[in-house]
A protein has these predicted regions:
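Glycine-rich phosphate/diphosphate-binding loop of Rossmann-like nucleotide-binding domains
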Residues: 1-25, 87, 91-183
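N-terminal ligand-binding/catalytic initiation module
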Residues: 1-81
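General beta-strand structural signal in soluble alpha/beta enzymes
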Residues: 31-32, 57-60, 81-84, 115, ...
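Short, ordered loop/turn segments at secondary-structure junctions
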Residues: 34-35, 60-63, 84-87, 144-145, ...
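A short, aliphatic-rich alpha-helical micro-motif
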Residues: 50, 108, 175-176, 196-199
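Conserved acidic residues
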Residues: 53-54, 180, 203
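Rossmann-fold NAD(P)-binding glycine/threonine-rich loop
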Residues: 71, 189-228
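Short, acidic/small-residue loops that bind anionic groups at enzyme active sites
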Residues: 76-90, 205-210
């Protein structure tokens, strides 16, 4: 997205989410923007609000801090804690993936999935896609340092290590060959037309980077009329 733009600049986004809660679920919400970067202090602040609210929806906390914040709040609080960037994105991607695989006539157990991005949203999506039947050995993760492979040390953490693969490929351009699915949760323009050409028949492309997608739909269709 736009990166760390501060709590004041995020307020219109939070207010917009509040409108969606009210319109589609009839839930009244309060948007609360907190000017705090220390994860432990953030947990203390949010936990202290429990007597006032019935649930907490976390928004726009960077990885890996978001995993710690959510985990600690769930331990301490007796009300539901939901991280929108992780679980909201994962639910949407999971539903879309089920339908896309049906349309493409592909089996989740045999597809090759390549993801660009290894932040909170991407890792949450992959966690749900595992439960929907895509095997871990068929999932290839890329980030700013390239392919997440066994033995890599740069920009690695425990969550990425789970998806490390034994592969000689080091770049998105290499690993995308014969991929059935591209899941983009990274940055605009990273998926090139030449990469789309190298994907398997009836490729499924989720270009979800915000505000600019990894590739535009018209660019995909210009090189692959069988793409979904």
């Amino acid at each position: 997205g736009l990166g760390d733009i501060g709590p004041l600049a995020s307020k219109p986004v939070m207010e917009g989410k509040g409108v969606l809660f009210k319109k589609f679920a009839g839930v009244d919400v309060f948007d609360i923007e907190i000017d705090e970067k220390d994860p432990a202090k953030l947990v203390d602040i949010i936990a202290s609000l429990e007597p006032t609210f019935g649930a907490i929806n976390l928004e726009d906390i960077k990885a890996p801090d978001c995993f710690y914040v959510e985990r600690e709040l769930r331990k301490r609080m007796k009300i539901p804690v939901f991280h929108d960037d992780q679980h909201g994105t994962a639910i949407t991607v999971g539903a879309a993936m089920i339908n896309a695989l049906k349309v493409a006539g592909k089996d989740p157990k045999t597809v090759k999935l390549v993801t660009s991005g290894a932040g909170a949203a991407a890792l949450a999506c992959l966690g749900l896609l595992l439960k929907l039947g895509i095997p871990r050995e068929n999932i290839y993760v890329t980030d700013l340092a390239g392919v997440v492979y066994e033995g890599r040390t740069e920009l690695m953490d425990e969550d990425k290590q789970f998806f490390a693969q034994n592969t000689p490929a080091r770049t998105l351009g290499e690993i995308i060959e014969d991929a059935d699915v591209f899941l983009g949760l990274s940055a605009g323009g990273v998926l090139k037309k030449d990469m789309v050409r190298k994907m398997a028949a009836r490729p499924i492309i989720f270009a979800l980077a915000n505000p600019n997608p990894e590739i535009l739909p018209e660019d995909v269709k210009s090189v692959r009329d069988d793409a979904i």
